[in-house]
Amino acid sequence: GTRTIQNIPTRVEFISREELDEKGSMKPGDIRMLLNESTGIITQQTSATSGNAAIRIQGLDGRYTQILKDGFPVFAGAASGLGLLQTPPLDLKQVEIIKGSTSTLYGGGAIAGLVNLISKTPEEKRELSLHLNGTSGKGLDVSGFYGQKFEKVGTTIFAAYNRNWAYDPSNTGFTANPQFDRYVFNPKLFLYLTENTEMS
């Protein structure tokens, strides 16, 4: 059978597009700030080298949290935190959060809960956004999004460059933030075959 968020008999929390746009201007590089503000969720950095972070729901280890992108698993178990660094807020329409066991629907990786990242889709009104952000922790984020729907075709294009320099504010020899460069380019094509049929 199908396994859609709409058919799950449990509470689903939403982070709306308005909130994503607001908080995304503060931290365009990832969605950790947004998730940290949700009750019962903690994002914990798991690697000083790559900057990967795990999502802990209700105190359980990050390997028990399942990350989905448009309803499909991104990474499972210990690698789930990689999805945080590959999904900047500018590319998202909303985020759905389920706390508690959904393992019967999504496997053993969803014992603590799941986070479903919903991508933007093109609309008839053209959307063009550009974000440039610098941080006191030696970080730089540049990202852009374009989306538009025509009669039978639509497209979205997301591109980003994230740069972080090693930052040691206490001069202890250990960096508070790792050094990395990240490039993202994510084009999508949508075909509207009929009024109720869409292919992407």
Q: How would you name each of these model-derived features?
A:
Residues 1, 100, 118, 131-137, ...:
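Outer-membrane beta-barrel pore domains and translocons
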Residues 30, 52, 82, 92, ...:
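Transmembrane beta-barrel architecture of outer-membrane proteins
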Residues 35, 95-96, 115-117:
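Non-catalytic regulatory/gating segments with a bias toward low-complexity or hydrophobic composition
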